Amino acid sequence: MNNVPIITIDGLASSGKTTISKLLSNHLGFYILDSGVLYRAFAYIKIMENIDTYTVDIIAKIINGLKIVPKKDLGFSIIYNSNDITSNLYNEETGLEASNISKNEDIRNVLLSIQHACVQEPGLIANGRDMGTKVFPEAMLKIYFTASIDVRAKRRYEQLIKSGSSPNLVNIQKSLKERDEKDINREVSPLKAAKDAIIIDSSELNIDTILDKILGLYKISRV
């Protein structure tokens, strides 16, 4: 793992992490890991199997059946007991449950080995909340995204409009503020920038400028 370049992208919700991660992956040809999908996998399994409480034995059973498989498009498929469950993970119920599961320290710890197994040649873009602080502290380049609440709410609003929803901007702002509070102040792996992370405020920067900046930082880190 030490010889494979890793770039971590952490930061606030709707700050641009996912967009820039995909662009970096396409530009560099690196695999891309969205760590949130692993918590969604646990959430989906909990819902489907009617699990009430995560005991040590149940967590071990799930981990034994859970695999993450690299795809040709540089993403990963989530396999559980030989079934591809990836397409089932992106609904509201699963997302809400995943938010609760992400606070479980036992689950976060057992997922470390799965996330480490995602390190593949020629490199990995790791997108999440604690990629640079806990999962890949040895990463060659760590980026932390931030942006104003107004800008992030507007971005989320526009995303929902494009998807056919009828969102309320004020409600989105409230939701983001609540999520920030939970992410930053939670006891297990709170959201924060790694000490050696480059902090990028994406409020006033366009995506091309940000991409060029990170690519430049990557080239410097390779020297």
Regions found by a protein language model. Name each.
Residues 26-92:
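N-terminal phosphate/diphosphate-binding loop that engages ATP/GTP or pyrophosphate donors
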Residues 18:
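Walker A/P-loop
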Residues 14-15:
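ATP-binding Walker
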Residues 7-9:
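Hydrophobic anchor at the beta1->P-loop junction of P-loop NTPases
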Residues 70-71, 108, 115-121, 128-138, ...:
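Small-molecule kinase domains that catalyze NTP-dependent phosphoryl transfer to phosphate-bearing small molecules
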Residues 142-151, 156-159, 164, 192, ...:
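Glycine-rich phosphate-binding loops of nucleotide-dependent enzymes
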